[in-house]
Amino acid sequence: MIPLAAWEEVIDASGVAPRIEAMLPIGVRRRQLSVRTLLAGLCLAQADHRPAHLTRAHRALTALPEQDQARLGVVTAWKDGPHLLTYRQTERTFGLIADALAKDEPDGLPSAALAGICDDLLEASIPAEFKDASRSLAVDWTDLETFSRPPPAKGGECADPEASWGHRKNNLPGPKDELFFGHYASAGIMMPDEGGRPLPELARRATLSSCRHDPARALVPVLTAMPAAGIPLGDILADSGYAHRDADAWALPLRAAGAALVQDLHPHDRGPKGTHHGAVIANGSLYCPNTPRSLLELGPLSRDAAPEAVTAHDARAAELARYKLGRITADDPDGYHRIQCPAAMGKIRCPLRPASMTLDRGRPEILQPPQHPQECCTQQTITVPPEITAKTAQKHNYPSKAHRRSYARRTGAERGFATAKDPASNNITRGWCRLMSLTPLMLSITCLLVVRNQRILAAWYTRQAENQRRAAAGLSPKTRKRRRKTLASLATRPP
């Protein structure tokens, strides 16, 4: 089990305890339970694979050694003798914290104070050696069902007025889509940069929002606030659920904050989607008007594709890249940039660009150029406004080999929630936290992610020590056997 000193170090490094104490009301009698001790108790309870119940936190604090109890104020000297912390005191202190961090008029989103407290706690759980090791984040959201019952069908209030109906998918037999009553929990997990060294997949940012709010829009202010905190944004790895949002809601604010998007496009956003000065808009890029339709409609590779299919797909993606109009300038302050015909750049042969016809015949050739060429074929360059590919433009050509390899890192977000939702440890199903409203839930989920980070770090250091031992013995690092099974692999497996 992770020792108490580890939680105290994280809480002290974050600096959140004094800030919260300053927000709490001051009574006639000094509170026995401090914010620092309560946060340590919440982490201790969840580190012991317990639910986020205040009774569990109280039990964890009262089970500490006598020396730690005296040091943390769990046992204090009253005029009648030593006094052991009671559950009522624990509940009272947590209630004061929740009231201080909540909004005056709850709307299903965290207050600025609550968001800052949770950000600082998560940032403090990341060791200094990994803070600058990567700027890439894999993002995702998951369901967090409230303990409250839904409001009556005939109308009326419920115990958790900030909760709302949401949609989730399950892996159980039967229907895959279902409704739940609660909130969406979003998180950003640190992933290695492209070509960077491996590092532990630590949760760096998280937020909670009612299901009446879009989780993608709720996560944007959390990510865009990171540069102001001295954490520059790098690659943001997201699935099509994020990429399908309006550009103003997701892509544009992240690009303005310095992020590079690496995401899967929604099926409705793939393929040709109009033209700009004659150039075909497809998959976030502009292509020659004579690009073969089959290349423009090239989709992503299936997960269980055979090696021959992978090779053929990569060859077609590389051929498609030759028809792409190349960028020759960076974005100006208004988001405009200029691109050039692929024949003028020497990527294909086209009669409309006589100089390109001197290139070798290994390049694709336009056999039937348009009789009435448009600006993309007659001008040296064309200007692209920011709104043309605002929603779908990203770091790599889609769906190229480079994009597939870079996007493969996004599974870290799935693993992040899988470790936090493991039934063998902390299962955040309904009843995991019985406190109502968004503020107590967000504090609890943040403490859980801090605990998860410490578990990941402990496993990381153990694995590195084992790899060093094996290297000293002349052995290669130990790897895990791939256990994913497909119908094709099962059918061809020998008996």
Task: Map each language-model feature to its residues.
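Short, charged, surface-exposed secondary-structure boundary motifs
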Residues: 270-278
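Short amphipathic alpha-helical "interface-anchor" segments enriched in bulky aromatics
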Residues: 277-340, 386-436
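Short amphipathic alpha-helical segments and their helix-coil junctions
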Residues: 9-28, 163-166, 398, 425-433
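Dynamic "connector" segments at or just before major functional cores
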Residues: 1-53, 66-122, 463-466, 471, ...
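Basic, amphipathic alpha-helical segments enriched in Lys/Arg and hydrophobic/aromatic residues
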Residues: 405-489
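Long, low-complexity, polar/charged, intrinsically disordered or flexibly structured peripheral segments
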Residues: 148, 163, 328-399
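Structural motif
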Residues: 26-37, 176-178, 408, 433-442
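Polybasic low-complexity intrinsically disordered regions
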Residues: 30-39, 56-60, 88-258, 262-269
